[in-house]
Amino acid sequence: MNRFQVKLGHLSNYIRNFSPIKSIAIMERIVNHPILTIPQEGEHTFLFNGKPVTGMKGFTIAAALHQAGYPVHSHSVNGRNRSLNCGIGKCGACEMLVDGEVKRICITKVDNVKEVSEITVQNYTTDSQIEPREEPVEIYRTDVAIIGAGPAGLACRETLKELGLNSIVIDSNDKIGGQFLMQTHAFFFFEKERRFGGMRGFDIAKTLAGDDHSGIFLHSTVWDILQNKRIAVKDMLNHKNFYVEAQALIVATGAVPFMPTFENDDVPGVYTAAVVQKMMNAEFTLLGKNILTVGAGNIGYLTSYQLMQAGAKVKAIFRGDAP
């Protein structure tokens, strides 16, 4: 057993006595922030398991439920509580019934939602038949297709434009910028041109694509790569399929967080940095006020710093390689 495993063992002992009930009381909406401007777009009330919950328009169901003190979205086959996992719509851990349809609440806005409930054997079956729709499928043609509108994808788009090549960028999110949208700190001068040094991450995200966003398809996901240099894309907002034909394909889909396994790593209140940053900096929701950070690298320190900006208290930063 290595030192990291020993440290995780200590962490498991700490989490063994963790109470989700305690964390429920200290989840809150962020109303003041020293860096970010918090928009006020009105409120919307929906029913969650029969109880009224009010959330901010333009923000997700997950944010509304956590702010209302409901971090549990599902249960395992053994009855264990389940909560957010990736927080960016990739894993399906937060799937719930939203007005009768299965949706991932970490990316589904509260706007116009009437009822949300946990998916159970009693309230959901897969016997329903989907009627095929005979609709013409649009085909877009370009030089290069780019999957991902984060820093890498947008940098590729910019370079291709300088070379005189056309491109189409496809991203499943509702905004461009990827992880830069979650970063409130000022970046160092890390590139030769010194274009972005000193700028905060979310400001870099606004400038990466310039003023011309043509050829960028948001709310869309690539679900198949076909023959004849064609990819199949689903417009998740309008529920339509379309094709993109390109001479080359660039995959710039970013990364997903790694969660080392330890006892009770699935307890609501134990989250990856990606979930914490997304809920905090994009959804203005603190998942807790008293924080223990596991990992003292770049991400651990930055997330802890951002949590302190948002009003949380970081009690300790846990290093797996510490003596």
Where would I find each of the regions flagged by the language model?
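FAD-binding core/adjacent interface of flavoenzyme oxidoreductases
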Residues: 78-81, 100-145, 201-290
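Short beta-strand to alpha-helix junction loop
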Residues: 188-205, 322-323
